[in-house]
């Protein structure tokens, strides 16, 4: 069985997707449902998918859990927690009675949108992420280069939590800029409790003029 580890679905009539900013994203500023996804992956050899939160909104995760419970295409859900909040684990507990809770496999916060580049090394973040590990949940790291130092420190502080680095931390592919990303990713790779999703590369390249050779140095 082949499971794709990262897909998003959304309904713009239910909530806005605040990250869809600028003309470049106009082609995807439309609803994208699980059936749209099913059609898109036809013939790709993908049997199931993990759906991942898209917004910092506690209402979205219950919807994704219900989707997982009702559609066999969904193998798991990565839900949302504001991971630096004192009540983050209480919010996690609030998911437990919900339909589809058994499909919750991980948690993500959109850390790269926060101005504080040390966000992921906050003591409360460390505490909450350690608790995720005790509960058998993965923490998805959504970072860019400025946030990687804190991400590395978090992974080191939580040896019993498994981490997934999303989108190889969004290096500056369009600028062919390897540093400090290359040193950071090498250090992160030395830690046994983290893996990486090779995803989201095209969005960091020159959208109109990219070629496959642009990506080789980052892989």
Language-model features and meaning:
Residues 33-37, 59-62, 88-93, 148-149, ...:
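Alpha-helical scaffolding within the catalytic cores
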Residues 27, 31, 89, 122-126, ...:
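Non-membrane alpha-helical structural segments and their capping/turn regions in soluble enzymes
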Residues 1-10, 14, 42, 123-124, ...:
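A generic "structured core" feature
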Residues 8, 55, 169, 201-202:
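Catalytic metal-binding/acid-base residues of hydrolase active sites
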Residues 75-79, 162-167:
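Short hydrophobic/aromatic-enriched beta-strand-loop microsegments
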Residues 59-146, 153-155, 190, 195-204, ...:
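Active-site gating/metal-coordination segments in enzymes
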Residues 172-219:
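H/E-rich (His + Asp/Glu) clusters that bind or coordinate divalent metals
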Residues 1-68:
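An N-terminally biased module of ancient metal coordination in phosphate/nucleic-acid-related enzymes
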């Amino acid at each position: 069985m082949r499971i794709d580890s990262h897909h998003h679905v959304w309904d713009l009539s239910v909530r806005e997707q605040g990250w869809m900013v600028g003309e470049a994203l106009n082609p995807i500023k439309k609803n994208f449902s699980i059936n749209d996804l099913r059609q898109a992956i036809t013939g790709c050899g993908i049997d199931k998918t993990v759906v991942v939160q898209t917004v910092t909104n506690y209402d979205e995760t219950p919807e994704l859990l219900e989707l997982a419970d009702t559609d066999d295409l969904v193998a798991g859900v990565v839900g949302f927690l504001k991971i630096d909040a004192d009540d983050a684990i209480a919010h996690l507990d609030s998911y437990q009675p919900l339909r589809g809770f058994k499909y919750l496999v991980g948690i993500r916060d959109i850390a790269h949108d926060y101005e504080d580049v040390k966000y992921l090394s906050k003591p409360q973040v460390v505490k909450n992420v350690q608790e995720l590990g005790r509960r058998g949940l993965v923490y998805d790291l959504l970072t860019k280069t400025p946030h990687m130092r804190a991400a590395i420190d978090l992974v080191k502080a939580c040896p019993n939590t498994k981490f997934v680095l999303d989108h190889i931390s969004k290096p500056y592919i369009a600028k062919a800029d390897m540093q400090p990303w290359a040193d950071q990713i090498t250090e992160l790779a030395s830690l046994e409790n983290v893996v990486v999703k090779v995803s989201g590369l095209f969005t960091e390249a020159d959208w109109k003029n990219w070629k496959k050779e642009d990506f080789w140095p980052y892989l």
